[in-house]
Amino acid sequence: MNITIALPKGALLKGTIARLQAIGIDFGEFLEGSNRLLRLEDRSGRYEGLLVRAQDVPVYVAYGQAQVGIVGFDVLKEKQLPVAQVADLGFGYCRMSVAVKSDSPYRSVQDLPAHCRVASKFTTCARSYFEERELPVELIPLYGSVELAPLTGMAEAIVDLVSTGRTLKDNGLVELEKIFDSTARLIAHPLSYRLGRVGLHELLGQIRTAAVPA
């Protein structure tokens, strides 16, 4: 019986494919510029890869269309889906942060005015963060160029992923506070994981301990 692996499009794809290649599972065709395929079978015929949006990886795993997935912790926190979180794979580091305009009067999250507007692609994470601190805010969901929200006056702050901080700096923004760190996580379909589907635990162990060339 084949095991299906959900691979994330975007920043984590290259690292995901490298880790799978390190244990003999090659979905490198997904990286080719001319590739239009969304499903691939590896040479052994034992594994199938699904190339999906990062936000959809835990959805495919939770519903059992994939038994294994690799996805950022940020997506898991945002989606809150019932998947087995098997391991932190350590690559693809970034952080979820609150940021404001560098010339704003705010020097900490506590300085933000009550009921101020906060823009984010990660409204679940943002809501949880501000509720834990008992800071009432109005969340504005955006799905691209979140940095524009403070620059245009739409919002006083944003909650977004930060990698190097270059994008924030280039757009005149500064981090106020880190909410959490995010790296690539290995996840599995909960029932398959609990019942020990044939070959699943062996595969998960290999992915977890794979020696990936630097």
Curated annotation (Swiss-Prot):
Gene3D superfamilies: Periplasmic binding protein-like II (3.40.190.10)
EC numbers for this chain: 2.4.2.17
GO biological process: L-histidine biosynthetic process
Any single GO CC term annotated in Swiss-Prot or TrEMBL for this entry: cytoplasm
InterPro entries in the record: ATP_PRibTrfase_cat, ATP_PRibTrfase_CS, ATP_PRibTrfase_HisG, ATP_PRibTrfase_HisG_short
Pathway(s): Amino-acid biosynthesis; L-histidine biosynthesis; L-histidine from 5-phospho-alpha-D-ribose 1-diphosphate: step 1/9
Protein localization: Cytoplasm
UniProt main location, coarse: cytoplasm
Keyword Transport appears in the UniProt entry: no
Keyword Plastid assigned: no
Keywords assigned: Amino-acid biosynthesis, ATP-binding, Cytoplasm, Glycosyltransferase, Histidine biosynthesis, Nucleotide-binding, Transferase
A GO term for molecular function: ATP binding
Catalyzed reactions per annotation: 1-(5-phospho-beta-D-ribosyl)-ATP + diphosphate = 5-phospho-alpha-D-ribose 1-diphosphate + ATP
Free-text note on domains in this protein's UniProt record: Lacks the C-terminal regulatory region which is replaced by HisZ.
Function: Catalyzes the condensation of ATP and 5-phosphoribose 1-diphosphate to form N'-(5'-phosphoribosyl)-ATP (PR-ATP). Has a crucial role in the pathway because the rate of histidine biosynthesis seems to be controlled primarily by regulation of HisG enzymatic activity.
Matches recorded under HAMAP family: HisG_Short (MF_01018)
Record text on subunit structure and interactions: Heteromultimer composed of HisG and HisZ subunits.
Sequence similarity: Belongs to the ATP phosphoribosyltransferase family. Short subfamily.
UniProt cross-references to PANTHER family, sorted A to Z: ATP PHOSPHORIBOSYLTRANSFERASE, ATP PHOSPHORIBOSYLTRANSFERASE ATP-PRTASE
Full protein name: ATP phosphoribosyltransferase
Organism: Gloeobacter violaceus (strain ATCC 29082 / PCC 7421)
Gene expressing this chain: hisG
